[in-house]
């Protein structure tokens, strides 16, 4: 996308992963009480990508260029597409309720609840069989880290709803809304979901799993991908 001049659209994942220029999280699901990665990522370009190609490279018909380009944007708006890029999504103080990195779902709060269920199942299943024979247990701890923090990006997405805004890059004469605050109901649901992640049952590693993580072996030092610790 960058090669042909397209920017990231970090609001695309809320609309059926409409762009390859978003960063969605791998899509996991529970099938018959087992974690499935069958649909981890989409294939091909999304509907928003088709909009950007049409806007940038289409042959203009026998009409004014401005009229044609405005019609492309209006059709995109009617289809529910929204374009929000890096400066609004990456910033730690970002307030857009739809623009996030490595998130999924039409609703950040509901997706957080869903990913926590998958995380719980993954932790229940975690065992020494998650590493190869003859690998040190120190590796097992590092394998556990991304599972333990599986919900971290969805937490970032959800917390932005609290005091958050839904806004667009609007020009004078445009038909899309300029901005509106997240409703109090949306914010309350987001707050409750965030507080749930602070429960001991979520934060605490089950005691039977702690036995899998002895002090680090010689030569296997901690990195930024490891838990912080002194043993």
Model-derived segments and their meaning:
Residues 1-8:
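Active-site recognition of the HExxH zinc-binding catalytic motif
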Residues 13-231:
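Conserved catalytic/binding loops enriched for acidic/polar residues
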């Amino acid at each position: 996308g960058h090669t042909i001049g397209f920017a990231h659209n970090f609001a695309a994942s809320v609309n059926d992963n409409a762009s390859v220029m978003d960063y969605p999280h791998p899509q996991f699901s529970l099938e018959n009480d087992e974690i499935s990665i069958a649909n981890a990522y989409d294939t091909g370009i999304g509907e928003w990508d088709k909009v950007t190609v049409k806007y940038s490279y289409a042959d203009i018909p026998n009409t004014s260029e401005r009229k044609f380009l405005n019609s492309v944007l209006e059709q995109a708006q009617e289809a529910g597409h929204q374009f929000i890029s890096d400066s609004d999504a990456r910033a730690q103080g970002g307030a857009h309720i739809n623009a996030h990195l490595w998130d999924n779902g039409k609703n950040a709060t509901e997706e957080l609840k869903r990913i926590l269920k998958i995380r719980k199942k993954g932790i229940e299943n975690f065992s020494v069989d998650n590493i190869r024979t003859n690998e040190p247990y120190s590796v097992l701890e590092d394998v556990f880290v991304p599972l333990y923090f599986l919900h971290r990006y969805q937490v970032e997405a959800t917390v932005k709803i609290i005091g958050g805004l839904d806004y667009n890059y609007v020009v004078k004469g445009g038909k899309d809304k300029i901005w509106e605050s997240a409703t109090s109901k949306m914010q309350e649901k987001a707050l409750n979901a965030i507080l749930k992640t602070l429960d001991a049952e979520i934060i605490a590693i089950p005691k039977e799993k702690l036995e899998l993580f002895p002090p680090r072996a010689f030569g296997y030092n901690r990195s930024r991908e490891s838990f912080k610790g002194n043993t």
